[in-house]
Each structure stands twice: as structure tokens, then as C-alpha cells.
A protein has these predicted regions:
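Basic, low-complexity segments
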Residues: 1-9
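Short amphipathic alpha-helical boundary/capping segments
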Residues: 9-17
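Short amphipathic alpha helix immediately N-terminal
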Residues: 19-31
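Hydrophobic positions on the alpha-helical face of helix-turn-helix-like DNA-binding modules
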Residues: 38-39, 49
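Residues within the DNA-recognition helix of helix-turn-helix
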Residues: 52-55
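Short Lys/Arg-enriched helix C-cap and helix-to-coil transition segments
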Residues: 61-74
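Helix-turn-helix/homeodomain-like alpha-helical modules used for DNA recognition
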Residues: 78-104
């Protein structure tokens, strides 16, 4: 998973992670710190840093698999984009699709 995907998932589900997992992900992905640098700052081993990051990533992926908030948000944005570009009848159809997505 790339940095953008992790950051996106963290923006949706970061509050569901432990504070330590969230902090480790922020330091590694947002602040671009190495495992060694994070280990020195936090006062844990590099292996513990790696474990914490891996667990955080795993939990973020599990949350998205179960809740699908990111996927649904992308679909809603696509429908809204379509609404902005079309005539009235098509706009009505897109609005209907949007309502259905929001009710899922």
C-alpha cells in the first residue's frame, strides 16, 4: 500500500487505532521518518516500530474491508461529478443513484 492510501485510510479510521499505532503511522508516512529515527524518538526497538506500523496498516485495511467508507465516498464523488456535467434528466438519475449510495 502506498503513502497516499495509508493517509486516506488514516483520515477515515485513524481514531479507531491505538494512539501508539496512529503516532507511528504519522511519523513514518507523514513525517517520512525511518524506523530507526522513530525508534529513537519513541524509545522502542526498530522491530517494535515495524510491528506497530504493520498492525496499524492491517487494522486500517480491515476497517475499510468491513465498513467501505473510502469506497463509498469515492462512488458518491463520482456521482456528484456526473451531476455537475449533465442535462436535467440525467441529473435526476444521478441524484437517485446518490441517494441509494447514501442509504447503503
Amino acid at each position: 500500500m502506498d503513502r497516499f492510501e495509508i493517509s486516506t485510510l488514516r483520515s477515515y479510521y485513524g481514531a479507531l487505532l491505538t494512539q501508539r499505532q496512529n503516532d507511528l503511522l504519522v511519523m513514518h508516512y507523514d513525517e517520512d521518518l525511518s524506523f530507526g529515527e522513530i525508534a529513537n524518538i519513541v524509545g522502542i526497538s526498530r522491530q517494535a516500530v515495524l510491528d506497530g506500523i504493520n498492525k496499524g496498516e492491517k487494522h486500517l485495511c480491515e476497517y475499510e474491508q468491513k465498513l467501505r467508507l473510502v469506497e463509498k465516498d469515492k462512488k458518491m464523488h463520482a456521482v456528484v461529478d456526473s451531476l455537475e456535467k449533465v442535462d436535467n434528466q440525467t441529473a435526476k438519475n444521478c441524484a437517485q443513484q446518490l441517494r441509494l449510495l447514501m442509504e447503503e
